Structure formats: structure tokens, C-alpha cells
Amino acid sequence: MLEFLNRFFGRESSSSKNVAKERLRLVLVHDRANVSPELLTSLKNDLIKVISNYMEIDDKALEVSLDGDDNQVALVANIPVKRLKRANSPVL
């Protein structure tokens, strides 16, 4: 029984440790890229405007983040698509 509790609580702290580690990594990526939260929000709004010309998207569920390591930073966007717009729709 004690072994079960140790494994159970050991996994919990390990999981919390990994979450904290990932959050710190994301903070460092944003810091190294010198990107403010305001710029990321502005970029997200611009992406919504452009992509909405071609697709109906769930803009409330859209996620934009920066990811990377010591050598490079990547922009990662998760954009839920509800449906594609017809090809003959006017594009501005």
C-alpha cells in the first residue's frame, strides 16, 4: 500500500515539475525572441482577419504561441477550421 502511495504521489510531483519546466521554457523563448504579449495578441488578430477571407474559423479557440530552442524560434498556430469558403468568394 505504501509503495502505491509513493508511486502515486511521485508521479504527481513529477508531472507538476514537468509543467513548471515547460512554462519556464516558454517564458525563456518569448524573452529571447523579444516578443511582447501585445505583439502576440496583435499578430493573432491579424491572422484571424486574413484567414477569415478563406475559411470560417473558430476565432475563440485559436491559439498562437512561440516555441523553440537555443537556435531558433517558431510561431505555432492552432486554428480550428469550421468550413472552407467557396473559391468564387471575393478576396480583398
From Swiss-Prot:
Which domain of life does the protein's organism represent? Bacteria
UniProt keyword list: Cell cycle, Cell division
Question: For this chain's UniProt record, which GO biological process terms are given?
Answer: cell division; regulation of division septum assembly
Give the residue spans that cross the bilayer. none
Q: Cystine bridges: which residues?
A: none
SUPFAM superfamilies recorded: Cell division protein MinE topological specificity domain (SSF55229)
In terms of InterPro entries, this protein maps to: MinE, MinE_sf
Please provide an example of a Pfam family that matches this protein in its UniProt record: MinE
What function is annotated for this protein?
Answer: Prevents the cell division inhibition by proteins MinC and MinD at internal division sites while permitting inhibition at polar sites. This ensures cell division at the proper site by restricting the formation of a division septum at the midpoint of the long axis of the cell.
| Family in the record | Belongs to the MinE family.
Q: Which NCBIfam families match?
A: minE, PRK00296.1
Q: Identify this protein by name.
A: Cell division topological specificity factor
What is the species of this protein? Answer: Desulforamulus reducens (strain ATCC BAA-1160 / DSM 100696 / MI-1)
Give me the gene this protein comes from.
Answer: minE
